[in-house]
Amino acid sequence: MTEHVQDENKLIAERRAKLEHIRTNCPANAHPNTWQRSHKAAELQAQYGEQTKEALEELAFQTSIAGRVMAKRGPFLVIQDVSGRIQAYAGKPVQGDLKERYQGLDIGDIIGVKGQLHLSGKGDLYVNMEEYQLLTKALRPLPEKFHGLTDQETRYRQRYVDLIVNEDSRNAFIMRSKVVAAIRNFMVKKEFMEVETPMMHVIPGGASARPFVTHHNALDMAMYLRIAPELYLKRLVVGGFERVFEINRNFRNEGLSPRHNPEFTMMEFYMAYADYKDLMDLTEEMLGSIAQELLGSTSMPYGEETVEFGGAYARLSMLEAIQKYNPDNATIQAMTYEQVKDVEFMRDLASSLGIKLEKFWTCGQLLEEIFGETAETKLMQPTFITGYPADISPLARRNDNNDFITDRFEFFIGGREVANGFSELNDAEDQDNRFKAQVDAKDAGDDEAMFYDADYITALEHGLPPTAGQGIGIDRLVMLFTNTHTIRDVILFPAMRPQA
């Protein structure tokens, strides 16, 4: 057993003994539930922080606070609640039983304090401890006692401790909540209706991904956690709800990375009588307004870059982006869509770029892999990439001028995809054929190919109006707004392998 563990175990034993003493001598004080808080720390700081010492003395303002003890320096305590920190002072008036109980306080305990508000000689607000109650005894010490909570894995496994001691972590999740609220408000103002669609699907669909499989006992059948809500949302558009959106979780049985968590949050929306260009315009308006609302600016730092959310964003086709970021590759510079349609040409090109090939890859998949390998990470500023091939866009409408590609875009910021949108395929016969092609791809070994959904075809046969739809990755968007570079830092409880 290490010295660190021995010291921690000793402290835990001491704290348990203190709690047992309270239970024995005054059981009602072990875990009381009657304390009434009148103010949060930030409220007191905002209302009285600018007062002079003399003015506060004359005011004789009484308050009741509650929170966690974060520091204990002689007669002063630093108490933290959800809004911030404030001090409490246990001076000469603290005598007898109150003094004894104060001396038994440990860092991490949750307490309530009542008393008059004062200003210290250093200009800090504090509450004079005229009444005090231990509300919860913390049996484990906070990690500052043991060199701080610096281990990333421990931060993710014990997020509750991370939130107690790391202000940056708390602020990131506060910002996440604000981003989601701002998106929801924006959509409602644009007359979108928020809906909820099934989380368990009989047929997984709406995206190319490997699903999680579960079993419905009562129906004795396999079901799938949803990989996307798309097909259900478009059924609602068929039903006459012309603008719908949903903010909820998707599940994809794939790997973990700084950009991927198997359980993640998406905002997906659909609007009738619109196309993919309308979606790009709406995205520019949405992100610019949200950045201004939450940050007070349309510019924000991200790593060593400054991302600009104001104004119009760059728009490039996938082929144009590949050519832009491979200026010295003569083959790429001369490449045309006719060559992109040649699978042997594309396999040779991808191989020459060091890309490990899969036998079942189509021309579109090869083009996407080349884009991902040579261009994607260079898209730091907000950029719409258009011209996605039809064979990797089974739900998107074909382009009128080039049926090899679709009216689809993906939206990139900070070198990663944040959103995906397109004019929806509303030709039931074309959709039927594309679903069948996906089944063939799955049979050829593509685990992420889509399933055939006969009921969705039936819905399309009732008539889907011209529609555009988009999904925005909330987690990746929050990474930008919080200047963090791993998705685990913006998911409260990310997926982790169980500890042995």
From Swiss-Prot:
This protein's name: Lysine--tRNA ligase
EC number: 6.1.1.6
Reaction catalyzed: tRNA(Lys) + L-lysine + ATP = L-lysyl-tRNA(Lys) + AMP + diphosphate
UniProt KW keywords: Aminoacyl-tRNA synthetase, ATP-binding, Cytoplasm, Ligase, Magnesium, Metal-binding, Nucleotide-binding, Protein biosynthesis
Main localization, broad class: cytoplasm
Source species, domain of life: Bacteria
One cellular component term from this protein's GO annotations in UniProt: cytosol
Binding positions for Mg(2+) 1 per the UniProt entry: 410, 417
Subunit structure: Homodimer.
One Gene Ontology term from the biological process aspect of the record: lysyl-tRNA aminoacylation
